[in-house]
Amino acid sequence: MEKFEGYSEKQKSRQQYFVYPLLFQEYIYAFAHDYGLNGAEPVEIFGCNNKKFSSLLVKRLIIRMYQQNFWINSVNQPNQDRLLDHSNYFYLEFYSQILSEGFAIVVEIPLSLGQPSCSEEKEIPKFQNLQSIHSIFPFLEDKFLHLHYLSHIEIPYPIHLEILVQLLEYRIQDVPSLHLLRFFLNYYSNWNSLITSMKSYFLFKKENKRLFRFLYNSYVSEYEFFLLFLRKQSSCLRLTSSGTFLERVHFSGKMEHFWVMYPGFFRKTIWFFMDPLIHYVRYQGKAILASKGTLLLKKKWKSYLVNFSQYFLSFWTQPQRIRLNQLTNSCFDFLGYLPSVPINTLLVRNQMLENSFLIDTRMKKFDTTVPATSLVGSLSKAQFCTGSGHPISKPVWTDLSDWDILDRFGRICRNLFHYHSGSSKKRILYRLKYILRLSCARTLARKHKSTVRTFMQRLGSVFLEEFFTEEEQVFCLMFTKTTRFSFNGSHSERIWYLDIIRINDLVNPLTLN
């Protein structure tokens, strides 16, 4: 309880900052422009092909924002060309995008000011201790061998976009900033559609990456806050009073509604939630909740999560979005892999004096395989091959130079090998390399209007070297005098490269153009 109250006090301190006046400062938009150009993932600035920053247009925007009818016209006529009171498409896009990027920069300031310094790092509660993506797969190798059941969770989505604004109310009490956020959401979703509208969802994500990430992280952190807090501090649920939770907006009202639906819920001792060997891992919109407990315990957790998220957080959680699996009998899709924990049987002959007998030993092994079907489907959608995996040429790249074409195909191949280097079976990767290599050859042959055989003979070993991976280059240096060398021996080697910062685009077909 003291940890929760301490966290609530920190949240209080974050509410003292009013950031709306910063939107009238020109340097905020210049900073947003520099972030878009120099960030880890460069994006097209303001949705236009022109990446130049115009301080004159920014000054005009700030002057228009001071006008009394600026926001009135924008809100009353969101679907017309009068958005931001300007009919020119260029100014329309520029103003909306620059406001979105600037707002995303400004709204992050209260949260960053509330973060503890290095000297206060020891005071951070344990349930806020998050780990980097670099540690996910080593963690799975170490822990999953000792666990029994797994819940594969698709993180629920809010029923209405207004919930995204309400989630920020207890962190930011700057009312004008919240109204501005409603304006952006109203513009991209017409304010009447659900967040499940994939068209408006991806449009908002594409054109407002920084703002989208901020909203999504705030939304997920709210969901995980209750999940992890109740997991590690579940003894507090034995209390009948809800006074401790009053720092949450509308929490008491939701508790009364929940009390009507489930009378006596908080009076029961939920001792069955206390499982010291439960582990939580999340990446993007998926999460894993693994435990050593029984199947009954996992079913109770599933029921609890569904009811809790719906009645307390207004998150639309369908029961089928939480799938229960036994680790030894199934595999699950996570981070572009198909991990599983199969049981391998090993017969050992034991000799004792004149008697010998066999011992049946069962051993668990964390196994990660490459999803062949999804990767081939992604290559097919990207027009590198047919649906059955037959390589084809890529006509849209024939206007590039030969070396640019070779570099693009080779980079995709090396990235696939690099990302899936921890797979226990890599034969599918060599099949993907064959598809990309032949697709590259056919693209070059189509460009020069020749046959694949003729083009391959002209390039020779230079063509093959572009598709060499790191481990193959090491083998080539060790065996430079060997004319024939097979890399099949490296299929079983597993190396987790720790420079993976995001999932490969080919793993998620939705990211392909």
Curated annotation (Swiss-Prot):
Annotated GO MF terms: RNA binding
Main localisation: plastid
Tagged with keyword Phosphoprotein: no
InterPro entries xrefs: Domain_X, Maturase_MatK, Maturase_MatK_N
Subcellular location(s) of the protein: Plastid, Chloroplast
Transmembrane parts of this sequence: none
GO biological process: mRNA processing; RNA splicing; tRNA processing
GO CC annotation: chloroplast
Top-level lineage group: Eukaryota
Family to which the UniProt record says this protein belongs: Belongs to the intron maturase 2 family. MatK subfamily.
Protein name as it appears in the record: Maturase K
Gene assigned in the entry: matK
